[in-house]
Amino acid sequence: MLPDYTDLLIKRFENPDEVRTFEKGRFELIKIGGMTIGRATYEPGWKWSQHVAPVAGTSLCQVEHVGIVISGQAACAMEDGRSYVMKPGDIFYIGPGHDSWVVGDQPYVSLHFLGAEKYAHD
């Protein structure tokens, strides 16, 4: 059993506080230490503008992200056309106004330290 004290708290994504699911993906949230951390898991073929936009109600993701890629690869394209492929170990900042999609045939997993509470939410 994991400790649950006021000065020490350990949580795991195997038991998240919240799970947001959508076609080809899921976003798990852990609330700890006054912040919300998210774990994104997307299947090959996932694309934000196709699979999350209907939930968010916008054509591009308007959430600001800071995170790290754990496995797989994803491309990110900004509204002005700039794009980048994110790979395992990349620590990223992505501003509002972007699309993203899985690159290749491996699932993509990343941790999000900024923006998690607003992601895949109306």
Regions found by a protein language model. Give the residues of each.
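Glycine- and acidic-residue-biased ligand/ion/polar-headgroup-sensing regions
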Residues: 35, 54-80
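Conserved short histidine dyad/triad with adjacent acidic residue
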Residues: 39-60
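Short acidic-glycine-tyrosine-enriched beta hairpin
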Residues: 78-97
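Short, acidic/polar N-cap/turn motifs at the starts of alpha helices
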Residues: 17-19, 26-27, 37, 64, ...
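Short beta-strand segments in beta-sandwich/barrel cores
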Residues: 47-48, 72-77, 100
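A short hydrophobic beta-strand segment most commonly corresponding to one strand
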Residues: 39-40, 93-94, 99, 104-122
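A short, N-terminal "cap"/entry segment at the start of jelly-roll beta-barrel domains
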Residues: 1-41, 49
